[in-house]
């Protein structure tokens, strides 16, 4: 029974950490000119130093307290496909 309680505490701590990070991201987006975060979205691109290949994070705040991010990395493309692989993370801050 102690292991179950410990697991619960670990999961709770991880959720609280993600909620804190999502809240900080929401505040940063609002300070960066997102006057209406319900309909705004942006893409942040970082270039890898050696490969000069962009890794983009698409950020969307569809409603107050919710942040959607998608990590796009062009190196995951196959030769025959033209779309990037995306990993979606949805965070609820409320």
Curated annotation (Swiss-Prot):
GO terms for biological process: wound healing. It is found in: Cytoplasm; Secreted. Its main location: cytoplasm. Coiled coil: none annotated. One of its GO terms (cellular component) is extracellular region. Induction: By lipopolysaccharides (LPS). Down-regulated by cytokines IL1B; TNF and IL23. Up-regulated in tears from patients suffering from different forms of dry eye disease (DED). Keywords: Cytoplasm, Secreted. Putative surfactant protein. May be involved in wound healing and in the reduction of the surface tension at the ocular surface. This is Surfactant-associated protein 3. It comes from Homo sapiens (Human). The lineage of its organism: Eukaryota, Metazoa, Chordata, Craniata, Vertebrata. The gene is SFTA3.
């Amino acid at each position: 029974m102690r292991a179950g309680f410990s697991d619960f505490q670990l999961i709770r701590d991880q959720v609280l950490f993600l909620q804190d990070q999502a809240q900080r991201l929401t505040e940063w987006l609002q300070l960066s000119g997102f006057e209406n975060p319900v309909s705004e979205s942006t893409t942040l691109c970082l270039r890898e130093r050696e490969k000069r290949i962009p890794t983009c994070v698409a950020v969307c705040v569809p409603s107050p307290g919710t942040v959607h991010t998608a990590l796009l990395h062009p190196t995951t493309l196959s030769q025959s496909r033209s779309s990037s692989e995306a990993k979606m993370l949805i965070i609820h801050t409320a």
